[in-house]
Amino acid sequence: MEVVLYPDSVSRRALEAASDTNSTFHKGHYMSIKRVEARYKRRQIKRQRNRAAQTRTATFENTSSLQSLTDAAYEACKTIKWKNSVQKYMNNTMLNTLHAHKLMTGGSKITGRRKCFTLMERGKIRHIQASPFWEKVIQKTISRNVLIPCYTRSYTHGNSANQRGRGEMYAIKLLRKQLARHYRKHGSQGWILLCDYSNYFASIPREKVLQQASERIQDKRIMPWLEQLMDAECDSGLGLGAETNQQLAVGYVSKIDHWIEEQSGCEATGRYMDDLYVIDSDLLKLRSTLDEIKRMSEELGLTLNPVKTYITSLHHGFTWLKKKWYYTDTGRIITRPIPKTIKRMRQHLRALARLAARGELSWKQITAMYHSWRGTLKHYNAWRTIQSMDAYYKQLKAKNETL
């Protein structure tokens, strides 16, 4: 009898023995092929039942309901209540929620006029298209009720971006834990593969994103909403302004995460948005892993940045998420911000001091901004950097007060 291979973890010996119709699992014997098939079907039914329970909110009616839109409005305004447009919307929450409900259920246009601007983020120019607040409410309800339950349940442990309870600090703590485990086994001898995609958001093929979303979302009436939000952002790829695009972009390369963790055999891995790393003690294994990542990325329509994608030794240290990582002689893991980050912050403080000298900004506002940035350094080994920046900040403030 032919033995069928299933996606489950079934041992080779069990499958070989399953070809015998008389074999059982009793007293050390293996199951027959019929029992293997029956168990596989039960597992599939259980998975489908669990998936349906987890995505029960991902329906057209629930996503566009007045209650979901109201909850989304209060969630979306949490950090931007000082804005005039937000205050106008929240002063008439009931009427605005009803209007959004009619737009979503009536097949009308759910996107508004974009406000386009360019900003410099950590030395990189980013073109942003900001949507009006009423559209952000619609994006929030789609993200909360559809994308998060349909996507995040299948994310790997190392996927750190755009999830509740995760973020940059989660990614940093995870990498520290993995580096500590590696040192206990191999010392500082080992290798790390660092990958970064070229122009990640803009290069994501829109057709493949929609196809992936269609496979995850059962209610197909939701798909026109996603298509409208994508078309309003830009002509190709995904824009940086919509929350829905952030969720779709994080989940787009989840297939690669699963392959690395489950099939590559590498020691450790993690990803924050489009910044990926893989750790292993075998250099040849990492090279073959890189070749497979390139192949899978090409299938997804993405291209790895040749400058930022490389393999380096853990002994010499590496840079990830704008932080310098390395081992000491005793195995302690040191994490420090790169010098470019500190230099850029000094330039920023000088620019703010000039605004304060002209009376366009108060030092109370500058102090709040500086202490917010300073608080992030406390999570790293940057005591000397903090002392140096404090002295520089006090020098600028004293010089400004004497003018």
Tell me what each language-model feature is:
Residues 1-98:
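Non-catalytic, polymerase-adjacent accessory regions of viral genome-replication enzymes
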Residues 2-43, 131, 136, 140, ...:
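Right-hand nucleic-acid polymerase module
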Residues 75-87, 119-129, 156-158:
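Glycine-/proline-rich flexible loop or hinge segments
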Residues 86, 90-93, 165, 238, ...:
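Conserved phosphate/pyrophosphate-binding and hydrolysis machinery centered on Walker-type P-loop NTPases
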Residues 102-124, 137, 144, 221-233:
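Reverse-transcriptase-like RNA-dependent polymerase core
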Residues 125-156, 234-262:
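Conserved pre-motif C helix in the palm subdomain of viral-like polymerases
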Residues 173-273, 277-292, 296, 302-303, ...:
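Conserved polymerase palm-domain catalytic core
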